[in-house]
């Protein structure tokens, strides 16, 4: 039986939700920023090409951020908390940035004697750039590779290579500035920061912070247009965004054939597993074993396909648990155990847009015949 066509946007939403988990963002952060970006495109009267690039940049900005996460965790500790705090500050403000890094190191070395803690913080700050710069550069490269695997064109991939660049040139990996930063990057960076700041600080403080960063992190003309229409742009974006909304916003709806779907599932599997060295290839191996078992049971080809694809994504909910937790020797704390037990729930939500291709198994990951 021929499988029903799958919209590429469904895969984009799955990737978006997964990256929200891994980066500590609030619920439907990428989806809400996509809606905001497309509303901004409306008030700016942007053409179809610009809308297409903004749409994809908003959903996929952080898809490469699982790469080498173990290196960030080894140096800074809980990488999800670190990323959550990063979105509330202006990274171009050196004092704010250093203060955040000091907090991260103090969390990591909590319980150490004062002299050891002080030395660990000094050493961590001194060695930080040797960790951060190559890892963050790698995020851009991995994002571009994933985008290529799911069939996205070169102009979208180019924008994903600039996810940490800023208008003022204080970004990474190349320190680009002004119009050298791709237009979708400039729009989506501001939109996503607006969502995060509004969530954390409230509407009025968010407006002040966005205005203050004009000419720094953001292009001044974009800030002016955003603040002129800010009430309209953010209306209703303090809650979840449903699948139908994102599908309706897709500028050029695109369906994927069986071969493209298979590669997209593989890309998701690899994205899940790249956080830690000992999980590389895990989901592929589980999928191979599960498909072989399904074939041995005499299941029809369509069911074997569904089992294989569900196995590709079975661990997607684990992205909500920090790598520093998985890699630390010793038993989990009560809070960490609760986080680990919740990962099937997060997996089911992440896979909701893909329907039976993964949702059911994602919600039962970790279950066994013995209960």
Predicted regions mapped to residue ranges:
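Histidine- and acidic-residue-rich, metal-dependent catalytic cores
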Residues: 2-371
């Amino acid at each position: 039986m021929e499988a029903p066509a799958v919209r590429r946007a469904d895969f984009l939403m799955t990737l978006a939700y997964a990256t929200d988990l891994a980066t500590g963002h609030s619920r439907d952060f990428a989806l809400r920023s996509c809606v905001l970006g497309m509303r901004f495109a409306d008030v700016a009267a942007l053409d179809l090409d610009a809308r297409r690039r903004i749409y994809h940049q908003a959903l996929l900005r952080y898809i490469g951020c699982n790469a080498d996460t173990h290196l960030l965790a080894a140096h800074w500790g809980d990488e999800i908390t670190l990323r959550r705090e990063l979105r509330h500050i202006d990274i171009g403000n050196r004092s704010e940035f250093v203060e955040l890094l000091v907090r991260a190191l103090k969390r990591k070395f909590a319980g150490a004697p004062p002299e050891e803690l002080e030395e660990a913080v000094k050493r961590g700050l001194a060695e930080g750039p040797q960790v951060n710069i190559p890892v963050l550069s790698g995020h851009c490269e991995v994002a571009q590779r994933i985008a290529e695997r799911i069939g996205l064109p070169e102009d979208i991939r180019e924008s994903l290579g600039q996810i940490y660049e800023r208008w003022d040139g204080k970004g990474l990996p190349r320190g680009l500035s002004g119009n050298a930063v791709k237009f979708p990057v400039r729009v989506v960076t501001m939109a996503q920061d607006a969502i995060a700041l509004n969530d954390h600080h409230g509407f009025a403080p968010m407006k002040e912070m966005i205005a203050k960063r004009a000419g720094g992190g953001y292009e001044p003309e974009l800030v002016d247009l955003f603040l002129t229409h800010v009430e309209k742009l953010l209306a209703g974006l303090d809650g979840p965004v449903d699948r139908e909304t994102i599908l309706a916003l897709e500028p050029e709806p695109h369906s994927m054939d069986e071969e493209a779907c298979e590669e997209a599932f593989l890309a998701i599997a690899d994205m899940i597993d790249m956080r830690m060295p000992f999980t590389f290839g895990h989901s592929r191996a589980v999928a191979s074993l599960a498909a072989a078992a399904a074939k041995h049971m005499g299941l029809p080809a369509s069911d074997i396909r569904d089992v294989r694809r569900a196995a590709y994504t079975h661990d997607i909910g684990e992205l909500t648990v920090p790598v520093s937790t998985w890699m630390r020797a010793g038993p989990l704390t009560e809070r960490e155990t609760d986080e680990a037990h919740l990962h099937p729930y997060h997996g089911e939500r992440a896979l909701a847009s893909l329907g039976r291709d993964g949702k059911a198994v994602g919600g039962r990951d970790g279950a066994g015949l013995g209960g």
